[in-house]
């Protein structure tokens, strides 16, 4: 699994998950995780925080998802953006599946000369609360097909 649980000194009662750079043997800075594969972690405690950026695409089920006490109703086609350190809470029983594109800031910084590139992305600005958008069915289908293709064929190589 690509999540590491560690004790968070600032928020002792909230699990913190760390990006696992060597999941496939060599170092990586980006990964795609299928939501149904992380439910076992959410069964322990659906409230958690991450040390990396997360763009979650919901493909099945409807429910609620909260980030830093801001609750969002989500359904298939919704995309949720979150930053490191935000407190997240999943409605794990109703949000059935989807994909999370997870990455560290180092991933984007390695491709762009601007060290603050990720902060310039509107959904990841330091003072902005998390955001949710809804994609049209045709756009979400294309994105999910691409994610599925890369997840199955590229990450398994």
Feature roles, as predicted:
Residues 3-4, 11-27, 91-154:
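A hydrophobic/aromatic-rich effector-binding and dimerization subdomain
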Residues 64-66, 82, 87-93, 99:
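Short beta-strand His + acidic residue motifs that chelate non-heme Fe in jelly-roll/DSBH
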